């Protein structure tokens, strides 16, 4: 006879554990448990049957997987928390006894822990760590710009700023930056590293106000994890580029505000590979050559990967030959003895390259003219021919003091501008190699009014606003500078992270400028209204011409009075947007505020009357459109009948999809109405 199953020993009751039970099992406080879960990546779970998981109770509870909590029991950081708890007791006891020397010794020997094993567990491969780098970079840049406070020491801010500078130095070195967008929240950057798109947000360099409702203990735990992760990633990236990590910091230049100039890239020689850690400083030309010289000979000549493969093949052949012949130490050539001079090495490289080249042989079913496969060598050649990384290489820039120098120096150098071709005002920091009166300057970046400012400098320089640099990067070409001159109204700054073609395909709103760039049909939202206005004007002109052709003076006087009255009437875009979309959320409130500011109570009463009439006509149009289109009603009826055949889950999903589509259409109509109102106000 089978054993009777007891309640609560299997199923959801066994697979899930509450948070209070987890605290008792681990014997730690709630704050330590939260910290441990953040570091290990464990988060609450929602069981399908809460009552079964909670053993019959319906009280609101937080659940975790039982296996996750058992996994935490063997965590070394958990033991470090317990050691720190014992350490705190000893320090408090020494302070209570006024044993200051003992308390100082205890504080100097406080228990420490490392997160290296957690990084290796959470990110088994390097690509996994790159995929999770977005939040890490955004958090580091955030803390690098936050002023130090009671809960955050100045050393933490300095460490975050150092990691951010090292990351930006790598991006500038490899020219992997691809997109930049200036938004209200900050500046969005995107770089492609090892085939992975990494996007991060950099706040503007304003004085940050620390919010009081943010739990900095949780934020500091995330920051601790991200600092360790960033150290691992940067070490791997610098090592792949044959650079020594961390780069050497010149403290004197750093104290003078030199920025990236205070970090010096060091190339790793052959002695580094053998463990002698010989370093040599290098300039930009040497940095460009360093990654290709990752393996060198003893005499300093370059040893390519093909040379290593060729020598391994020779050693393998000699070993096979030695199995059948008597052993002879002199017959085994050494690696250094087989190396020829530089000229013969180049010829051997060409031969080896030809031997290693992939040759596509025609199969029996396909002819010789079939398409060849794309190889890694072809992809590398295509990547090397991309002109975008060297977009600004032929120009010399000067950054004015009101422009954020660190941000635009990073953008310019990431797209080919040499450090010797980027200068800034001495107020922004030391290290500028271009003076304000340098004749070589081709682009002077300004972001302030130019009234009363002298713009006469030697040479042929162009004064531009900062948006020109970002728009050139997103357009992947050098744009004309006339629309970006100081004092000019800037063109729309479109986001490069939005696929406008896909948005247009799904029926979303696409700006007119984006449509022109994509070559789509110009969907001008003000065209219909303009045609109606023109027709009305033509009818009025015909009526006037038919009723009183002889009284031309009176007609001209009436037209002049109408023009003057129209000129005196203030523009009210919020009212026009409300009348175009009377059901739009927030439009009524904006129109009321606008009416109070322009005309007071009379304008407010007039607004409410117009809104009521517009709302009534809108409902009437909606009602007539449903009654006057039998084809649409038949389609709706067929849709409802098909909807009854769906399951409950599918029906809910279909309803949510319809609601999302309706919201998208409403948003598109609202934006089109806003665009229509703005275009009318711009008319002379």
Swiss-Prot record:
GO BP, sorted A to Z: maturation of 5.8S rRNA from tricistronic rRNA transcript (SSU-rRNA, 5.8S rRNA, LSU-rRNA); maturation of LSU-rRNA from tricistronic rRNA transcript (SSU-rRNA, 5.8S rRNA, LSU-rRNA)
Bias (Acidic residues) occurs at 342-352, 528-543
- Location of region: Disordered: 284-352, 508-580, 612-684
* Gene Ontology MF terms in the entry: ribonucleoprotein complex binding; RNA binding
Stored InterPro entries: BRCT_dom (IPR001357), BRCT_dom_sf (IPR036420), PES (IPR010613)
Q: Where is the composition biased (Low complexity)?
A: 285-294
Keywords assigned by UniProt, alphabetized: Nucleus, Ribosome biogenesis, rRNA processing
What subcellular compartments does it reside in? Answer: Nucleus, Nucleolus; Nucleus, Nucleoplasm
Cellular component annotations (GO), alphabetically ordered? nucleoplasm; PeBoW complex; preribosome, large subunit precursor
BRCT domain span: 387-486
Q: Keyword rRNA processing, does the record have it?
A: yes
Spans of biased composition, class Basic residues? 612-624
Biased composition regions of type Basic and acidic residues, renumbered to the chain: 296-310, 544-570, 663-675
UniProt key word Oxidoreductase: no
The record's section on CDD domains has: BRCT_pescadillo_like
Task: Spell out the family assignment given in the record's similarity comment.
Answer: Belongs to the pescadillo family.
Record note on quaternary structure = Component of the NOP7 complex, composed of ERB1, NOP7 and YTM1. The complex is held together by ERB1, which interacts with NOP7 via its N-terminal domain and with YTM1 via a high-affinity interaction between the seven-bladed beta-propeller domains of the 2 proteins. The NOP7 complex associates with the 66S pre-ribosome.
What the protein does comes down to: Component of the NOP7 complex, which is required for maturation of the 25S and 5.8S ribosomal RNAs and formation of the 60S ribosome.
Q: What is this protein called?
A: Pescadillo homolog
Species this chain originates from: Malassezia globosa (strain ATCC MYA-4612 / CBS 7966) (Dandruff-associated fungus)
Provide the taxonomic classification.
Eukaryota, Fungi, Dikarya, Basidiomycota, Ustilaginomycotina
Quote the gene name from the UniProt entry: NOP7
């Amino acid at each position: 006879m089978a054993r009777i199953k007891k309640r609560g020993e299997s199923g959801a009751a066994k697979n899930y554990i509450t948070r209070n039970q987890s605290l008792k099992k681990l014997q730690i406080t709630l704050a330590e448990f939260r910290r441990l879960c953040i570091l290990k990546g464990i988060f609450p779970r929602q069981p399908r049957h809460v009552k079964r998981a909670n053993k019959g109770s319906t009280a609101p509870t937080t659940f975790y997987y039982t296996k996750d909590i058992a996994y935490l029991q063997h965590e070394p950081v958990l033991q470090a928390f317990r050691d720190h708890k014992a350490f705190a007791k000893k320090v408090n006891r020494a302070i209570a006894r006024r044993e200051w020397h003992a308390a100082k010794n205890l504080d100097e020997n406080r228990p420490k822990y490392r997160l290296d094993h957690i990084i290796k567990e959470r990110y088994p491969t390097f690509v996994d760590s790159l995929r999770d780098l977005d939040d890490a970079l955004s958090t580091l840049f955030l803390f690098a710009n936050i002023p130090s406070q009671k809960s955050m020491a100045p050393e933490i801010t300095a460490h975050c700023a150092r990691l951010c500078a090292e990351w930006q130095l790598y991006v500038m070195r490899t020219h992997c930056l691809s997109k930049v967008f200036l938004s209200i929240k900050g500046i969005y950057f995107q770089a492609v590293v090892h085939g992975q798109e990494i996007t991060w947000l950099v706040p503007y360099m304003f004085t940050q106000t620390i919010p009081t409702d943010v739990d900095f203990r949780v934020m500091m735990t995330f920051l601790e994890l991200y600092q360790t992760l960033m150290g691992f990633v940067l070490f791997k990236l610098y090592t792949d580029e044959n650079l020594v990590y961390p780069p050497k910091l010149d403290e004197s230049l750093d104290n003078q505000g030199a920025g990236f100039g205070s970090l010096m890239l060091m190339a790793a020689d052959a002695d580094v590979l053998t463990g002698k850690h010989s370093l040599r400083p290098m300039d930009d030309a040497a940095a460009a050559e360093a990654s290709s010289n990752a393996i060198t000979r003893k005499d300093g000549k370059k040893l390519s990967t093909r040379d290593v493969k060729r020598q391994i093949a020779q050693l393998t052949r000699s070993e096979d030959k030695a199995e059948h012949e008597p052993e002879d130490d002199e017959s085994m050539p050494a690696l250094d003895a087989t190396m020829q001079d530089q000229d013969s090495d180049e010829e051997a490289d060409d031969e080896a390259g030809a031997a290693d080249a992939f040759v596509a042989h025609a199969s029996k079913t396909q002819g010789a003219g079939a398409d060849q496969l794309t190889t890694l060598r072809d992809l590398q050649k295509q990547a090397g021919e991309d002109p975008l990384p060297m977009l600004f290489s032929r120009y010399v820039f000067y950054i004015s003091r009101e422009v954020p120098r660190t941000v635009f120096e990073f953008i310019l150098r990431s797209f080919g501008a040499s450090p010797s071709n980027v200068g800034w005002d001495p107020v922004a920091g030391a290290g500028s190699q271009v003076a304000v009166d340098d004749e070589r300057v081709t682009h002077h970046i300004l972001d302030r009014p130019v009234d009363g400012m002298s713009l006469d400098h030697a040479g042929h320089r162009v004064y531009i606003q900062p948006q020109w640099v970002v728009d050139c990067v997103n357009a992947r070409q050098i744009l004309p500078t006339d629309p970006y001159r100081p004092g000019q109204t800037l063109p729309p700054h479109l986001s490069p992270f939005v696929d406008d073609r896909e948005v247009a395909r799904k029926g979303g709103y696409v700006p007119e400028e984006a449509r022109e760039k994509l070559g789509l049909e110009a969907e001008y939202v003000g065209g219909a209204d303009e045609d109606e206005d023109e027709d009305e004007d033509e009818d009025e002109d015909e009526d006037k011409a038919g009723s009183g052709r002889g009284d031309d003076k009176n007609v001209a006087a009436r037209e002049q009075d109408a023009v003057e009255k129209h000129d005196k009437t203030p523009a009210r875009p919020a009212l026009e947007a409300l009348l175009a979309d009377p059901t739009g959320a927030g439009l009524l409130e904006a129109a009321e505020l606008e009416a109070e500011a322009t005309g007071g109570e009379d304008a407010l009463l007039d607004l409410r009357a117009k809104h009521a009439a517009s709302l009534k006509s809108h409902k009437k149009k909606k009602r007539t459109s449903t009654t006057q289109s039998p084809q649409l009603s038949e389609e709706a009826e067929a849709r409802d009948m098909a909807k009854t055949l769906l399951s409950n889950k599918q029906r809910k999903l279909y309803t949510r999809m319809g609601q999302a589509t309706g919201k998208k259409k409403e948003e598109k109509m609202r934006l089109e109405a806003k665009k229509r109102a703005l275009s009318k106000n711009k008319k002379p």
